[in-house]
Amino acid sequence: MLRTNVFFSLNKEMINTIGIIERFYEKNTPLYNLLIKHSTQVAKLAQRLAMRLVELKHQPVDVEFVSEAAMLHDIGIIATDAPGIYCNGNEPYIRHGIIGRAMLDEMGLYRHALVCERHTGAGLSITDIEKQNLPLPHRDLLPLSLEEKIVCYADKFFSKSHPDDQARTLSVARSKLLKFGDDTIARFDMMATLFGEP
């Protein structure tokens, strides 16, 4: 009965996420190691959350896709200016999701690309973007599918700046989003209601 609610992508092989990352990142550099560590942390939690949804709420979830998308969600950081996490590009860090989408779109990974674009914060609405004058497209960048929401939520429990720290508690993850306003907190709270404590 459990397996009937897990959606596995039977019509394709799982993609080689490490191979995709290595197209853009030099292996065993500080940035590569940080990205792999963070993405693996997020992927493990995202898989656990996905399976919990299947087991407790009997919701169909594409677990393979969740794992793949979690590994690739931050692929765009390489082009950003964030030296504290070894990123020496020119783009503002807030654009890493948009950049990641473009990278994965070019590879034909359109569904994975949307996760890149929609995982920042608890998603960004056009109102958030305009109010904060963010250097992003003027459109909603909100996680829509269940899988997108799982990866977005799981990402909030880990820090690239402090990759060796334990996963954040729900209250700490929520507190990190307070500065982004009530709408962001409301979206996070809805995800927390759906997915629970990590």
Show the residue positions of the predicted features.
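Acidic/His-rich, divalent-metal-binding segments that scaffold phosphate/diphosphate chemistry
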Residues: L2-I94
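Amphipathic alpha-helical segments within well-ordered protein domains
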Residues: E22, Q47-M51, G100-D105, R174
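Exposed alpha-helical structural elements
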Residues: N16-R23, F65, R111, V115, ...
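Divalent metal-dependent catalytic cores for phosphoryl transfer on phosphate-bearing substrates
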Residues: V61-L170
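Charge-dense, low-complexity intrinsically disordered segments
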Residues: T29, N33-I36, L144, L178-D182
